[in-house]
A protein has these predicted regions:
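Polar/acidic, low-complexity leader/linker segments enriched in S/T/G and N/D
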Residues: 1-20, 205-207, 359-365
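Short alpha-helix capping/helix-loop boundary micro-motifs
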Residues: 38-47, 278-289, 408-414
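Surface-exposed cap/loop segments at beta↔alpha junctions
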Residues: 49-133, 137, 142-146, 171, ...
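Short, well-ordered loop/turn sites that connect or cap secondary structure elements
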Residues: 51-52, 292-293, 419
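Short, Lys/Arg- and Gly-enriched loop/turn segments at beta-strand edges
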Residues: 65-73, 306-314, 322, 432-442
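Short, solvent-exposed secondary-structure boundary/capping segments
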Residues: 80-95, 179, 319-338, 374-379, ...
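Extended, domain-scale alpha-helical bundle/helix-rich regions
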Residues: 114-132, 138, 146-344
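Structural signature for extended repeat/solenoid scaffolds and their inter-repeat hinge/linker regions
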Residues: 170, 181-182, 358-583, 588-591, ...
């Protein structure tokens, strides 16, 4: 990069093909915000403005040889302001951090089983951030599932850091700037030799403006959440303020949800929210001409009450160097206005970056490991991939379990339907939270057609599919047909069917009843009680085409028609009737150790030949 040789208040280094002279800079820096440096420059030659974009540049503010403050960034804007005379041209250049490109990028994607630091590294790398530093004073927890949905990568990264209690700032050198992420005041930068005093004067260590307003803050922060793995867990956490303001009980703040199912994290979220409220009312406003101040930088402030370390929360630098153009000896000036807070006050960003609200329904595809058609856990959850998640490598192994709504749910009772692999499901989000999806049902599509075609639109019901690799002819089914005059309830078991009744069963048939057993046996076992079959009108027919009929009783069997009976019991067989006729077409044989034939009124024997004895 070319650097002008001018030893003055402002100097600039850039990739411009013609030397640039910086004449004015207004630089804005704030913790957890992108810096923006507006720089007016003059070029002696022609500048290709398009070639300047996304190129590095640095402005140095030289404070009388005592210190130099660098403002490094990439060019996000470069345009002509005015033409001076016939040669020099004035341009406006804007420098921003490399992270600013994340404000342009937007995405819809899921991150599984990663810490916030892991996710941020991906975001920073995607945005072309070359230098980062994480100064974290606690180990980040692994996040099971984190969604970025229709939001810029900067928006996503900012809200992620706010949820973790983190914040960021930038450190500048002559040839680079570093994005620093931290979660503790110890992570801020100590400005070398920066000790400022309140008072009136022209030296760089004087603060010429100072204001410390007293403001009311929340008296208590309460957060609450719910853990479906442990429904009785107490996730209501409270944090009282340490500020000695009156009426704190009148200013409670409640937040739902806490965005965590972890007790320790819920405590942290309550504390971080309280610290953010306290930090916001601890700010002082100041101004002066110490050019070494930087957002996220520590300096000592000396007052009548003593010396205390403060940290710059935001600052606006204004510098102008027009001595050469104005033709005067000293046409330079520098000043700043800043906000700062005591180092004894933990800094915390408010959770102000809105989470995307997942309104309406979303659709997803059910995932399962290779060879599995039903993939679930002990809570009936499934793995899914949203259609807006463009990852081609999404599998059941790198996805998170998602709960499934059932028509009824209790402790081992209710309904249970587990969506199967490759089917499409509708997904809603608890509290519209992108990290809390829940499957609410299945959807037919161009590949997965409804059970019944349009011609059978009067039918409704359930049809399953046999697992594994069951075809269209392998299913269980329970359906209804509501076509007028042809109403039907249909039950199909692909293999076996078992019915259990703990007490009574009543079956009423108003017309015909047909039972067909194509092959196999039929068995009815009555362990205790009576069996009765009553036909009030009609006939009973029992037919065995190729076999035999056996009836067995421990006590007796009785056949009865009117007054005529045939009784078989343990003593023998008794035939009683108004008339008993035995007709043997070929032979009739009566045989026993004792045979008695008796006619009370008359005994008649007849035959072509009668042989006795």
């Amino acid at each position: 990069m070319a650097e002008n040789d001018k030893k003055s208040l402002l100097s600039i280094t850039s990739t411009a093909e013609s030397p640039l002279t910086a004449v004015r800079i207004v630089a804005e820096e704030t913790i957890s915000q992108l810096f923006r440096f507006n720089i007016d420059v003059v070029a002696a030659g022609k500048i290709n403005t398009t070639n300047m974009l996304n190129k590095p540049a640095c402005v140095a503010v030289n404070h009388g040889g005592k210190s130099t403050r660098y403002f490094h960034g990439i060019v996000s804007e470069f345009g002509l302001l005015e033409q001076s005379g016939t040669i020099d041209k004035a341009y406006r250049m804007v420098l921003v951090p490399q992270l600013a490109q994340a404000a342009i990028r937007s995405d819809c994607r899921m991150f599984f089983n990663k810490t916030a630091q892991d996710i941020l590294k991906i975001i920073f790398d995607d945005a072309g951030v070359t230098k980062t530093a994480f100064r974290l004073y606690s180990q980040p927890a692994q996040r099971k599932a984190t969604a970025q949905f229709n939001e810029t990568s900067l928006h996503f990264a900012t809200r992620l850091m706010e949820e973790e209690g983190w914040y960021y700032f930038f450190e500048h050198t002559s040839d680079s700037h570093t994005l620093v992420v931290t979660n503790d005041n110890n992570g801020f930068y100590t400005i070398p030799g920066a000790t400022l005093r309140l008072g009136v004067g022209t030296t760089a260590d004087m603060i010429t403006e100072y204001r410390k307003p007293e403001l009311l803050a929340a008296g208590k922060v309460t957060v609450k959440d719910y853990d479906f793995d442990a429904p009785d867990k107490n996730l209501k956490m409270e944090q009282n303020t340490i500020l000695k303001h009156g009426g704190t009980s009148n200013r409670p703040v409640f937040h739902w949800p806490a965005l965590t199912r972890d007790t320790d994290m819920a405590k942290n979220r309550a504390r971080w929210r309280m610290e953010a409220a306290e930090a916001a009312v601890s700010l002082i406003a100041g101004g002066g001409d110490n050019g070494g101040l930087v957002a996220g930088g520590k300096f000592k402030l000396r007052t009548d009450a003593g010396e205390q370390v403060h940290i710059v929360q935001s600052i606006t630098h204004s510098a102008e160097d027009v001595s050469e153009r104005a033709g005067v000896v000293d046409g330079t000036n520098y000043s700043n206005r800043f906000m700062a807070f005591p180092n004894t006050t933990p800094w915390r960003q408010p959770m102000a970056t809105a989470r995307p609200r997942m309104e309406g329904l979303h659709t997803a595809k059910v995932l399962a490991p290779s060879g599995e058609e039903i993939h679930t856990d002990d809570q009936g959850r499934i793995k899914i991939r949203f259609f807006w998640d463009w990852r081609e490598d999404a599998t059941a192994d790198n996805s998170e379990w998602v709960r499934v709504v059932q028509p009824w749910a209790g402790n081992q009772w209710g309904g249970q339907f587990i969506p199967r692999v490759d089917t499409e499901v509708a997904v809603a989000f608890m509290d519209a939270d992108p990290d809390r999806p829940v499957v609410i049902g299945g959807l037919y599509n161009g590949n997965d057609k409804p059970i019944f075609p349009v011609a059978e639109k009067t039918k409704l019901g359930f049809r399953t599919r046999s697992v594994t690799k069951g075809g269209t002819d392998a299913f269980n089914e329970f359906t209804f047909d509501d076509k007028k005059g042809n109403e039907l309830l249909f039950l199909h078991a692909q293999k076996d069917m078992r019915t259990e009744v703990e007490n009574d069963q009543t079956l009423t048939v108003e017309n015909d009843r047909t039972v067909t057993i194509n092959k196999g046996d039929e068995s009815v076992t009555l362990k205790q009680g009576d069996q009765s079959t009553e036909l009030k009108l009609g006939n009973i027919s029992v037919k065995c085409d190729l076999g035999s009929i056996t009836m067995e009783a421990m006590q007796s069997i009785t056949l009865k028609v009117g007054l005529n009976t045939i009784k078989i019991d343990q003593t023998g067989i008794t035939v009683t009737g108004l008339m008993i006729k035995i007709d043997g077409q070929v032979l009739t044989e009566v045989k026993g150790l004792m045979t008695q034939v008796q006619g009370t009124a008359m005994l008649q024997l007849g035959g072509g030949i009668i042989s006795i004895g």
